Each structure stands twice: as structure tokens, then as C-alpha cells.
Regions:
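HotDog/MaoC-like acyl-thioester-processing domains
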Residues: 1-14, 101-132
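Catalytic strand-loop segment that frames the active site of acyl-thioester-processing enzymes
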Residues: 2-62
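Hydrophobic beta-strand-centered segment that forms part of the acyl-chain substrate-binding groove
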Residues: 56-59, 69-111
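A generic structural signal for short beta-strands and their flanking turns/coil linkers
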Residues: 21-23, 31, 41, 85-94, ...
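Core FKBP-type peptidyl-prolyl cis-trans isomerase
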Residues: 65-68, 126
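Predominant activation on well-ordered alpha-helical scaffold segments within soluble catalytic domains
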Residues: 33-36, 68-72
Length: 132
């Protein structure tokens, strides 16, 4: 697996393409604890294994925003990567939902589809992805 490097303008030809899922990423307790420290979100369902075991989740769960922010690496592993870019910027998110908790120690990966490539000028594009 891994991303294929292409010219941004070539990504237009990939609209509607569903890529093979990328590599698995484990959201282990150390990663969850580090995210809790960075965001100062130490809610017990994320960091207290004993207390979280008494909840309907049966153990600690990853922060939804940790799962969301992991998409940068997960998408990089599974889809096209534009060549010769200076930077990529998150423009925003549409219809983000957290449909199920991710228990500590579980693995996640991304299924990516290019939905749209909109040129803004000769050097800037907005690329819209559907990610599940």
C-alpha cells in the first residue's frame, strides 16, 4: 500500500475512484493519553481504564477528534499524493460523524474516494474526499 504521486491536475481524472484501504493504525492507550495531554481532555472514558471498564464501552475509547486527526496519515497511506506542492491545508470538513467508539488498542484505516477537484487558480486546488 502507499500513496501514488501524481500532478494535482491529474487528480481530476480520478474523481469517483475508490482507493484500496491503506495501512492499519492502532489507537493504543499511549496514543490516547498523549492526545489527552495535548488537548487537556482527560475525561475518564479516555484515560481511566478502571472507571471506563464500568461504562457501556467496556474500556477506554479514543477521542473522536484523535480519530479524525489520524486521517492525515491514514489518507496518505491509501490514496493519491499530489507532487510538487508547497503545502496542503485542511479547508474544512463536511458531515463529520462519529458512528462508533474506537476502543483503546483497536485498529483503524481509511477508505478514500476523490469526490471533486476544483481548481482555484493555476496553483491552488480544493480536493474533496469521501472518507470512511
Amino acid at each position: 500500500m502507499g500513496s501514488k504521486v501524481v500532478a494535482v491536475s491529474e487528480m481530476v481524472n480520478q474523481i469517483g475512484h475508490k482507493f484500496e484501504p491503506g495501512n492499519w493504525m492502532t489507537l493504543d492507550q499511549d496514543r490516547i493519553n498523549s492526545f489527552a495531554d495535548c488537548t487537556e481532555d482527560h475525561q475518564f472514558i479516555h484515560v481511566d481504564e478502571e472507571a471506563a471498564a464500568q461504562t457501556p464501552f467496556g474500556g477506554t475509547i479514543a477521542h473522536g477528534l484523535l480519530t479524525l486527526s489520524s486521517l492525515v496519515k491514514l489518507c496518505e497511506d491509501s490514496s493519491l499524493y499530489p507532487e510538487n506542492i508547497v503545502m496542503g491545508i485542511n479547508y474544512g470538513f463536511n458531515k463529520v460523524r462519529f458512528l462508533a467508539p474506537v476502543r483503546a488498542g483497536k485498529r483503524v484505516r481509511a477508505h478514500v474516494e476523490i469526490q471533486n477537484v476544483e481548481p482555484k487558480d493555476e496553483k491552488r486546488y480544493v480536493v474533496t474526499l469521501a472518507i470512511t
